[in-house]
Amino acid sequence: MTAEQSDLAWMHQAFIDVQTELSFKIQRANSSIGHSGAKGAVNEEHWLEIFRAYLPNRYEVASAFVIDSLGGRSHQIDLVVYDRHYTPTLLDQQSHRYVPAEAVYAVFECKPHLDKAYLQYAGEKAASVRRLHRTSVAITHAGGAYSPRAPFPIVAGILTARSSWADGIDDTFINHLPTEADELLDCGCALNDGAFDRFEGELKVRGADGALIHFLFRLLGKLQSLGTVTAIDWSAYASILDATKEEP
């Protein structure tokens, strides 16, 4: 084995170890915690830790509601990837965080396993975010102003420990993916069975070996391609105060 091959083998094993550790933590929570709500919260926190460790500091990750300037609000989302530097969260109360829709890059649901019901549920959660109104304003620079940009499509996915189908992420799984535009799942990871994404249009599936790191690196590439979120029209949010005064 050459030195280069040895280095690659070491790196490959390190990536596998990260996946094994997360899988063990989730398995331990599932076997030692009886209350389903508490179990879900612990597993959700494990996924949040992984995302915080591997995403660059320009991104913030949290469980949150997503809101818009028209008063719309999403379902509670297990894991929201949003802009860290340019967009403050609003109305934070303890663990209840509210993130402006314009700040959101991606949303994920954390579930015990992949099955038809959870895929549908994740799609509905994604739609509750994608249907929100997003503003965009011009950005001033030394030579004038950049025109307002159209918001990019928000990425949506699902995170689980395993697939409930015997063959993992197979044709049966694919046939149960949501098909409505607002409910589409762009990516997902089932630790013990593999990962998938359609960032380039065609659905790509990865087996269990290195699935977690493969998923994270593919997600990093997708987030990188989105660039920066649009500049928020804060006056639209300020107008909420006047709108409520006019109500009888």
Predicted regions and their residues:
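Intrinsically disordered, low-complexity Ser/Thr/Pro/Gly-rich regulatory segments
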Residues: 1-76, 81-248
